[in-house]
């Protein structure tokens, strides 16, 4: 403080008050030198008298002074400031405000540290539990709003107005009764745009690091993502594993901040603030949702599957570009936590509705736009969550406004920013505007505010020059025409960035030197272009260029109505509350309050300072508030902010939504007026950084001097040397404090002058005015004997060290020790919490120790979600649709029969399984699933039947036989490349395989090869007794049976009788080497290894043999030959030396059996064999003898009639199908002759539905129809725009593109009119605008009519869009009502008026309508040829032409479609045209007959067609396939059904060119849709009796064949 100069014995650095330094030391240089001298002896602070504190960050500890205690430290000075403010609060009843100022938002000036010391000091003055809650609240604020920047780990990114509320019961020590956290404009852009080398908000890192394994599992965090909690560096594996887009570079996950502990403290703080555990868990789920939103990957895809809400030219030929989410697993996590359906959430990312020129349009977004949409949702969620938490805190800590007597306000706003780290110009502008305003308040407090009162009191003080930033402050913040007001006004008006820049230039050019706009002269360089698109503001801390690109859109800060309506369907109560809070201001439609048009996250605090809610009383004033008319305005504004949210929202509804700049300006104005109120005493804390490199204990004079100059500290110090007055006391109060009684005689002024003389206070600290005395705070304290008062300091809860425990034992914060700076130690927004030596910052360690509370312990260390729904349950709830009661419609008999078939095929799948595992809670969805399954089963059954019919059926009729005729056996003789086969007793063996294994191997293969193709039975004599049991069960071994070959023509070649090789195989009884079983063993071996088949005997050949006296016959398909037996080929022979026994029976076969073969030679004896009168034992013995001795082969039935049928039946079917194809081709040839067009005078309508096509496609389609060689006056071009939608790649809505092509200026804006649309419920009401005029192109002047479906005013998403079918119905319903003379809707009346009165043609004159898709180009003669065909045959109802590809050579996929398109038209449609029954008239290029030529009877627009085609109730799978997947084909079906006497035709002479899918995925998707539509429409056509042709070859049969071929196509292709 000013006083006598220090004596020579006192070192210069001992003087803490800068104004007390000599006058020659009051320059910037000398003051900087003085600060340096104090800094180097451990005194990093100085004072500007009693009103301001200057603090330098030492980057070491802020709690130790030169002597090792807190004396002289930043912490000690903060305590002293708090005590003085608290004392003044109690003694004078004044509101106190401490304003923090620093020259750079990224300075590392230690601001947050000083603020925490200051708050801790204030809280230590009260012993209520509320003190702890306020410390927790401050910690939560820092956790949610603080981040790490390049230069400091504790960069606050939201303005803080922290209010401590006191009652007035005690004039000495006021009681703390409440508090309030008022946050101003969080830097939302940081959520989705983390600058390089910086972090997002700390709480996101806390969540990732501090959750347990079970919690990570629930939140969808990969368990393999390892975040170390030891404070060390990340391992390479954990860094490289996964990158969180919203968390910056992976290295930022660990920068020496103990995130895991921070998360535990964050949860504990919320619990201490009385937030329920379930709500804290919901907070964490929303934070996890935000992180997952950053992980979504969007890709472009093609979609051809249409719904009721889709439309356009792509519906028949091409595809629509859509944006889809690549990683569906992440999407499902987000959907679960938000309580939404996965599909609807994914769809919402792909479009965005906004207002352009007073019209709402839906923009179809590309992947980049979808990414921005997801970023916007993340910003909205975080902003709402922060607002929700702060409002919850305030509800718990704020006292009733009428009980608050005084307040202490701590203002800490982000500092000045030279450049935007996140790329957000708006955040930078608003932050700098706030800093500019606070600095202006500082200057006003020191210079202007006191000067006005000094003049009134006739006190003269020397003037002090200073830098006044009023120009910049007024230019930025002036209400009405300040820069922020202009920005807000231009945003409301929907102006562009360039228009805003022009407005700024007009407002400030040559009027305010602080704001300039870049030169508008011509320039080509990037620098000059950038200068022209920016404005410059000369702030007190330097000039800043603000680019305007995207500034107005960012200022709008609009949350689209799409998102709001999506969130209204959430199944999560918390998310519903989040989006229902007052912080989200919604705009509803005036006529339909339930429809939310858009919303905005408020940039204005939800609460106001307590002092702003009431006028200042007449009690003890310090200095007067600024005079003017703003007091009433201030009161009015304060009153308006205290009204209910409903009133606020209705005001916003009437006046338009206020932008972020306007809201921030309003809140800043309230702050400014609170600070300028009469009963408030401000203190200022200037936070300076000693160097730019964050080096501990290093003082950079140049760096500090620049900050001293920026803040004007030298000028302020000089001002205080002249007038350091902080308090004004009226004479009576002054004399009462002086206690001089009646000792001095004179006036009050004279008495006061005597007191001042006695006190010997310096003149710059005490002066007598006309009505009172001006005093500095030091003099007032001396006068009031405040030094005798003791401010109580209460210990922190659970502390053993008294009051200091709540203060920072070390400058707890991010800016403390070298160890913290250089090593990975604990840092977090509560870095103050983790004090060294167990000391704390905001709160004591015990308070934050979850173990002190059993519940908190389980909450902190376990799974906080264990009592909540699992993620799967949340997802299931989100996917559930709200069940609505629907009217029961009568079910047709065919539907009942079909459902009976469905349940018959799917009965084995219980409904609860579909509901549980299939996640289909709705009954109609489950029924549709059953129908799909039934159709699949029918298709696969059909395919299985086709496979059976093709593969198995011939085998059933004619089983495969492995037999060889004698000719076939002879051909396998090993010659000319043939195989070598040999037969033995009717069995054929593979000789080629046998020869290598023949024993002995000395026999050459050549010798064996001569038997190839022969019957070698003669080489193998048999032992009869070993192979046949005979009649009695045994045969004498001497009985022999000779073998003799058949010499009938056609018999197999046998071994020559002169071949003696049989002796090597003779092991009969009479030989020296008797082996009875040798033959049987060899046959078993041969059959097992070399078997090929049997000798085959056809029935004819058998009969021939029988006629030749061969006793041969077949039993059960086996052929037996008893010729040798009957002829006496039985003899006996005994071994040498033995005699034949007497009475040997040589007839070992039963006589009845032999007699059977003799009686019926060459026949099938099976029936006679079964009827033979012998015993079963005898039958069994005779069967064994026949098989072993007389078997010669199998009956060969390969040429039987049955086998011939099986062979040629499939062939006949194939030939029949080929004949159909050939017939179709021949029928197609009948249409090769082109009809010659003539000059025609019929009126036609050319209709084009437009959806999201680009300008080039639309122009091609429109121009091609306008240039058709048809009388321009007799054709009407009608373009129907399906909704206000901006397609991907377009810069305007589709209707605007169409109108620009047709030359309709933007000034033409007709009123939207109502009409009936296709939709459910309220969707049936739609509105449209009608435009008409003449379109001129290449010499053609064509009348046009444009119908723009804009939707009801309450429609938000895809306004007006109802689908292509609805676009067709606009004209169909209009023409129907014209011809039937029915009442019309307002829009239809307008269409009638435009056509009848503007264009000048009676709508009934139009006879034909040509429907063309927006991506189709028609040939010049197309309309003429179609009309000629329709006139040539008045029984033709519809005619289509040939559609070719305009992108045939774009890709391989389009190339393969060229042939398909050609065949489908010139073969299929040409054939169908022969019958006059085209089953599908393509919507992309078809002309219909509106009315009959003779009677005028409506045809295309008849009541039956219009009613059936406008079906709204599409609740079955069949109807969905008809109306949603193939509306063109279904329309053709209706025409054939309701007008059976009329024909549908195809003419190849009419040409059009369309766009086909270029990717294989889209091609498959399109074909899948077409196949579904084809099958269901063919099913509709089958019952029609009118599908007849000539003779029996009917079109109905061909349709049935097409249906079958479509169903079994997978099999036929295979």
Swiss-Prot record:
CDD domains: MYSc_Myo17. It comes from the Eukaryota. It is a multi-pass membrane protein. Residues 9-19 have a biased composition (Polar residues). ATP binds at residues 105-112. Residues 1-22, 600-650 are annotated as: Disordered. Residues 668-692 are annotated as: Actin-binding. The keyword Cytoplasm does not apply. Its EC number is 2.4.1.16. Residues 626-635 have a biased composition (Acidic residues). The chain crosses the membrane at residues 898-918, 937-957, 1209-1229. Residues 1-788 form the Myosin motor domain. One of its GO terms (molecular function) is actin binding. Glycans are attached at residues 1047, 1072, 1572. Residues 961-1020 form the Cytochrome b5 heme-binding domain. Disruption phenotype: Causes strong chitin defects in the cell wall which results in over-compensation by other synthases following activation of cell wall integrity. Leads to a reduction of chitin in the lateral cell wall. Reduces drastically spore production. Leads to resistance to AFP, a small, basic and cysteine-rich peptide that exerts extremely potent antifungal activity by inhibitiing cell wall chitin biosynthesis. Keywords: Actin-binding, ATP-binding, Cell membrane, Glycoprotein, Glycosyltransferase, Membrane, Motor protein, Myosin, Nucleotide-binding, Transferase, Transmembrane, Transmembrane helix. Gene3D superfamilies: 1.10.10.820, 1.20.58.530, Cytochrome b5-like heme/steroid binding domain, Kinesin motor domain, Myosin VI head, motor domain, U50 subdomain. It catalyses: [(1->4)-N-acetyl-beta-D-glucosaminyl](n) + UDP-N-acetyl-alpha-D-glucosamine = [(1->4)-N-acetyl-beta-D-glucosaminyl](n+1) + UDP + H(+). One of its GO terms (biological process) is fungal-type cell wall organization. In the N-terminal section; belongs to the TRAFAC class myosin-kinesin ATPase superfamily. Myosin family. PANTHER family: CHITIN SYNTHASE (PTHR22914:SF45). Polymerizes chitin, a structural polymer of the cell wall and septum, by transferring the sugar moiety of UDP-GlcNAc to the non-reducing end of the growing chitin polymer. Acts as the major chitin synthase in Aspergillus niger involved in cell wall integrity which is principally responsible for chitin synthesis at the lateral cell wall. Plays an important role in septal growth or maintenance. Mediates colony spore formation. The N-terminal myosin motor-like domain (MMD) does not seem to have motor activity but is indispensable for polarized cell wall synthesis via binding to actin that ensures the proper localization to the hyphal tips and septation sites near actin structures. This is Chitin synthase csmA. It comes from Aspergillus niger (strain ATCC MYA-4892 / CBS 513.88 / FGSC A1513).
């Amino acid at each position: 403080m000013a006083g006598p100069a220090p004596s020579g014995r006192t070192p210069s650095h001992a003087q803490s008050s800068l104004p007390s330094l000599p006058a020659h030391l009051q320059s910037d240089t000398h003051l900087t030198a003085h600060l340096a001298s104090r800094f180097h002896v451990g005194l990093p602070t100085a004072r500007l008298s009693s009103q301001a504190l200057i603090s330098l960050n030492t980057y070491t500890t802020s709690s130790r002074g030169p002597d090792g205690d807190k004396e002289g430290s930043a912490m000690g000075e903060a305590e002293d400031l708090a005590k003085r403010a608290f004392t003044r609060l109690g003694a004078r009843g004044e509101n106190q405000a401490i304003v923090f100022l620093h020259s750079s938002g990224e300075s590392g000036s230690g601001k947050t540290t000083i603020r925490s010391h200051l708050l801790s000091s204030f809280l230590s003055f009260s012993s209520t539990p509320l003190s702890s809650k306020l410390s927790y609240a401050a910690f939560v604020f820092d956790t949610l709003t603080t981040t790490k920047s390049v230069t400091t780990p504790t960069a606050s990114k939201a303005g803080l107005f922290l209010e401590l509320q006191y009652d007035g019961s005690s004039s000495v020590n006021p009681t703390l009764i409440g508090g309030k956290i008022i946050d101003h404009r969080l830097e939302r852009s940081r959520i989705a745009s983390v600058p390089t080398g910086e972090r997002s908000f700390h709480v996101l890192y806390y969540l990732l690091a501090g959750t347990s394994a079970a919690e990570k599992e629930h939140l969808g965090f990969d368990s393999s993502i390892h975040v170390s909690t030891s404070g060390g560096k990340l391992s390479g594996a954990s860094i490289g594993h996964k990158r969180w887009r919203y968390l910056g570079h992976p290295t930022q996950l660990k920068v020496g901040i103990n995130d895991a502990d921070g998360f535990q403290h964050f949860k504990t703080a919320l619990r201490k603030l009385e937030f329920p555990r379930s709500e804290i868990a919901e907070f964490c789920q929303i934070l996890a949702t935000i992180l997952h939103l950053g992980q979504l990957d969007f890709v472009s895809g093609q979609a051809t599957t249409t719904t009721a809400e889709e439309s356009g030219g792509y519906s028949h030929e091409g595809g629509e570009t859509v944006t889809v989410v690549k990683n569906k697993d992440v999407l499902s996590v987000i959907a679960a936590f938000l309580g939404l359906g996965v599909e609807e959430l994914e769809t919402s990312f792909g479009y965005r509705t906004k207002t352009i020129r007073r019209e709402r349009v839906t923009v179809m977004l590309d992947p980049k736009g979808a990414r921005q949409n997801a970023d916007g949702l993340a910003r909205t969620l975080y902003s709402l969550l922060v607002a929700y938490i702060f409002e919850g805190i305030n509800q718990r800590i704020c006292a009733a406004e009428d009980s608050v007597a005084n307040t202490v306000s701590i203002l800490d706003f982000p500092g000045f920013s030279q450049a935007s780290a996140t790329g957000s110009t708006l955040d930078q502008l608003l932050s700098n505007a706030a800093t500019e305003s606070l600095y202006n308040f500082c200057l006003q407090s020191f210079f202007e505010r006191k000067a006005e009162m000094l003049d009134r009191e006739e006190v003269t003080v020397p003037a002090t020059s200073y830098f006044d930033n009023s120009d910049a402050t007024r230019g930025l913040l002036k209400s009405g025409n300040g820069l922020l007001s202009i920005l807000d006004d231009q945003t409301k008006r929907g102006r562009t960035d360039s228009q805003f820049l022009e407005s700024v230039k007009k407002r400030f050019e040559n009027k305010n030197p602080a704001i300039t706009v870049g030169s508008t002269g011509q320039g080509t360089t990037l620098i000059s272009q950038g200068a022209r698109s920016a404005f410059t503001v000369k702030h007190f801390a330097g000039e800043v260029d603000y680019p305007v690109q995207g500034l107005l859109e960012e200022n709008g800060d609009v949350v689209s109505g799409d998102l709001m309506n999506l969130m209204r369907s959430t199944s999560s109560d918390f998310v519903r509350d989040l989006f229902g809070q007052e912080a989200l201001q919604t705009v509803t439609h005036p006529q339909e309050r339930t429809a939310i048009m858009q919303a905005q996250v408020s940039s204005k605090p939800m609460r106001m300072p307590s002092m702003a809610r009431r006028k200042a009383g007449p009690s003890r004033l310090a200095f007067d508030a600024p005079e003017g008319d703003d007091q009433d305005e201030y009161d009015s504004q304060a009153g308006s902010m205290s009204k209910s949210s409903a009133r606020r929202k209705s005001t916003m509804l009437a006046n338009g939504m206020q932008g972020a700049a306007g809201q921030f300006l309003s809140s800043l104005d309230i702050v400014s007026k609170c600070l300028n109120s009469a009963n408030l005493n401000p203190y200022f804390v200037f936070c300076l950084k000693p160097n730019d490199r964050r080096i501990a204990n290093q003082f950079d004079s140049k760096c500090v001097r620049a900050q001293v100059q920026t803040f004007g500290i030298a000028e302020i110090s000089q001002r205080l040397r002249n007038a350091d007055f902080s308090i004004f006391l009226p004479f009576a109060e002054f004399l009462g404090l002086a206690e001089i009684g009646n000792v001095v005689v004179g006036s009050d002024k004279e008495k006061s002058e005597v007191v001042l003389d006695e006190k010997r206070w310096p003149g710059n600290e005490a002066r007598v005015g006309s009505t009172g005395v001006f005093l500095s705070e030091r003099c007032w304290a001396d006068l009031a004997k405040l030094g005798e008062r003791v401010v109580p300091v209460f210990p922190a809860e659970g502390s053993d060290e008294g009051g200091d425990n709540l203060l920072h034992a070390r400058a707890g914060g991010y800016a403390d020790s070298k160890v913290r700076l250089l090593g990975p130690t604990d840092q977090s927004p509560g870095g103050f919490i983790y004090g060294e030596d167990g000391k704390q910052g905001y709160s004591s360690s015990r308070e934050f120790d979850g173990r002190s509370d059993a519940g908190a312990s389980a909450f902190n260390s376990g799974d906080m979600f264990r009592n909540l729904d699992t993620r799967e349950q949340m997802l299931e709830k989100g996917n559930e649709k709200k069940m609505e009661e629907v009217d029961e419609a009568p079910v047709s008999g065919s539907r009942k029969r079909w459902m009976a078939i469905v349940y018959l095929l799917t009965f084995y799948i219980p409904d609860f399984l579909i509901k549980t595992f299939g996640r289909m809670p709705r009954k109609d969805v489950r029924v549709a699933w059953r129908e799909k399954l039934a159709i699949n089963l029918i298709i696969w059954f059909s395919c299985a039947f086709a496979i059976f019919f093709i593969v198995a059926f011939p085998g059933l009729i004619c089983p495969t036989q492995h037999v060889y005729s004698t000719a076939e056996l002879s051909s396998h003789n090993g010659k000319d490349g043939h195989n070598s086969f040999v037969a033995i007793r009717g069995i054929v063996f593979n000789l080629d395989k046998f020869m290598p294994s023949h024993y002995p191997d000395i026999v050459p293969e050549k010798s064996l090869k001569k038997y190839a193709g022969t019957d070698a039975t003669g080489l193998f004599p048999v032992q009869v007794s070993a192979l046949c049991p005979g009649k009695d069960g045994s045969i004498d071994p001497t009985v022999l049976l000779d073998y003799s070959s058949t010499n009938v023509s056609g018999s197999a070649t046998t071994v020559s009788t002169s071949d003696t090789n049989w002796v090597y195989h003779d092991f009969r009884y009479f030989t020296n080497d008797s082996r009875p079983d040798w033959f049987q063993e060899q046959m078993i071996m041969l059959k097992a290894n070399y078997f090929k088949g049997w000798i085959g005997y056809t029935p004819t050949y058998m009969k021939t043999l029988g006629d030749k006296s061969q006793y041969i016959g077949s039993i059960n398909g086996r052929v037996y030959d008893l010729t040798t037996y009957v002829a006496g080929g039985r003899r006996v022979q005994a071994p040498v030396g033995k005699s034949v026994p007497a009475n040997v029976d040589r007839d070992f076969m039963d006589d009845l059996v032999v007699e059977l073969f003799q009686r019926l030679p060459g026949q099938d004896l099976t029936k006679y064999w079964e009827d033979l009168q012998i015993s079963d034992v005898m039958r069994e013995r005779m069967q064994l003898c026949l098989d072993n001795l007389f078997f010669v082969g199998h009956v060969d039935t390969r040429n039987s009639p049955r086998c011939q049928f099986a062979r040629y039946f499939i062939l006949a079917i194939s030939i029949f199908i080929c004949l159909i194809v050939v017939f179709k081709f021949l029928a197609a040839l009948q249409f090769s002759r082109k009809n010659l067009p003539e000059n025609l005078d019929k009126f036609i309508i050319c209709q084009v539905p437009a959806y999201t096509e680009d300008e080039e496609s639309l122009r091609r389609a429109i121009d091609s129809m306008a240039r058709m060689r048809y009388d321009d006056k007799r054709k009407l071009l009608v373009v129907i725009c399906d909704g206000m939608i901006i397609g991907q790649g377009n810069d305007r809505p589709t209707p605007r593109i169409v109108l620009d092509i047709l030359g309709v200026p933007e000034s033409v804006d007709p009123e939207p009119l109502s009409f009936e649309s296709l939709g459910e419920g309220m969707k049936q009401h739609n509105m449209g605008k009608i435009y008409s005029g003449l379109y001129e192109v290449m010499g053609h002047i064509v009348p046009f009519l444009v119908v723009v479906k804009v939707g009801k005013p309450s429609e938000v998403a895809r306004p007006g869009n109802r689908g292509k079918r609805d676009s067709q119905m606009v004209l169909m319903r209009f023409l129907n009502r014209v011809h039937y003379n029915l009442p019309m809707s307002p829009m239809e009346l307008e269409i009638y008026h435009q056509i009848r009165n503007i264009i000048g043609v009676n709508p009934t004159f139009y006879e034909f309508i040509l429907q063309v898709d927006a991506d189709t180009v028609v040939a010049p003669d197309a309309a003429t040829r179609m009309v000629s065909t329709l006139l040539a045959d008045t029984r033709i109802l519809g005619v289509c032409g040939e559609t070719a590809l305009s992108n045939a050579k774009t890709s391989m996929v389009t190339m393969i479609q060229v042939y398909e398109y050609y065949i489908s038209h010139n073969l299929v449609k040409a054939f169908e045209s022969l019958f006059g029954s085209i089953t599908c008239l393509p919507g992309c290029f078809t002309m219909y007959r509106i009315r009959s030529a003779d009677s005028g009877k409506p045809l295309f627009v008849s009541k039956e067609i219009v009613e059936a085609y406008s079906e709204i109730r599409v609740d079955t799978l069949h109807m969905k396939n008809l109306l949603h997947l193939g509306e063109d084909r279904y329309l053709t079906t209706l025409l054939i059904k309701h007008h059976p006497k009329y024909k549908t035709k195809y003419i190849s002479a009419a040409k059009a060119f369309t766009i086909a899918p270029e990717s294989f995925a889209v091609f498959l998707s399109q074909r899948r849709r077409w196949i579904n539509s084809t099958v269901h429409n063919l099913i509709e056509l089958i019952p029609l009796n009118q599908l007849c042709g000539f003779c029996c070859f009917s079109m109905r049969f061909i349709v049935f064949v097409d249906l079958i071929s479509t169903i079994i196509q997978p099999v036929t292709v295979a």
